[in-house]
A protein has these predicted regions:
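Conserved Rossmann-like nucleotide-cofactor binding loop
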Residues: 2
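Conserved SAM-binding loop
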Residues: 7-8
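Hydrophobic/aromatic anchor residues within beta-strands of the central parallel beta-sheet
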Residues: 16-20, 66
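A short acidic, Gly/Pro-enriched loop at the edge of an enzyme's catalytic core
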Residues: 23-36
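A short SAM/SAH-binding and catalytic strip from SAM-dependent methyltransferases
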Residues: 34-48
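A short glycine-rich, Lys/Arg-flanked "PGG" loop and its adjoining helix->strand segment in the class I
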Residues: 50-65
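Alpha/beta-hydrolase-fold catalytic nucleophile elbow
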Residues: 69
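Substrate-binding/catalytic lobe of Class I Rossmann-like enzymes that use SAM or dcSAM, i.e.
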Residues: 72-182
Length: 182
């Protein structure tokens, strides 16, 4: 909800105001000029990848495009990851699942969504995670006053460090895929 409000506030004074909705993607109807999905693909989990891409295909107008930003992992790392849940799947995003870059593209292709451009930015995302970690440490006393305990802090310290390490060592990537209907 706070991201929704932020987006609504940002577009408030535009001449042409885009439609921004807070809705379960599976309930979305109509046809759109574009679809933008930011770090949601990995949250739906592999069980729902088909319905995710099917929905994108169904709501795009002819010649429309979709931009999907998602976190992926190397193919080698994925081969073990899909068998043994990691820290993030266990404690942060139960049910979520990352794909490899090629698996993401293959899954999109099943629904006639062709990847026409990929932009990767793992190193800058590692810096973002470092900044989030620093801000979390600075804000901890305020967060603790809201009732969060030391276990919560350790979990988030681990999560932010774990992710940063994955981006720095090349196991994780954050990418934006520009897709069009074939």
């Amino acid at each position: 909800p706070s991201q929704f409000k932020f987006a609504k506030d940002r577009i408030e004074n535009l001449e042409t105001v885009p439609d921004i909705e807070l809705i379960d993607y599976r309930l979305l109807e109509g046809k759109f000029d574009a679809v933008v999905s930011i770090e949601m693909f990995e949250a739906v989990g592999s069980e729902y990848w088909n319905s995710y891409f099917q929905k994108i295909q169904n709501v795009l107008k002819p010649n429309a495009k979709a931009v999907i930003q998602t976190i992926t992992m190397t193919k080698d790392y994925f081969e073990g990851y899909d068998k043994w849940p990691d820290f993030i799947q266990t404690y942060i995003f139960p049910g979520g699942e990352l794909a490899s870059d090629q698996l993401f593209i293959d899954e999109a292709n099943k629904f006639d969504l062709e990847n026409i451009k990929t932009t990767n930015f793992a190193k800058s995302y590692a810096k973002t995670l470092e900044t989030w970690y620093e801000n979390f440490q600075i804000a901890w006393s305020d967060i603790e006053e809201m009732g969060f305990d030391a276990k919560f802090k350790r979990t988030w310290d681990m999560y932010l460090a774990y992710c940063r390490g994955g981006f720095l060592n090349g196991q994780l990537e954050v990418s934006q895929y520009l897709l069009k209907v074939k």
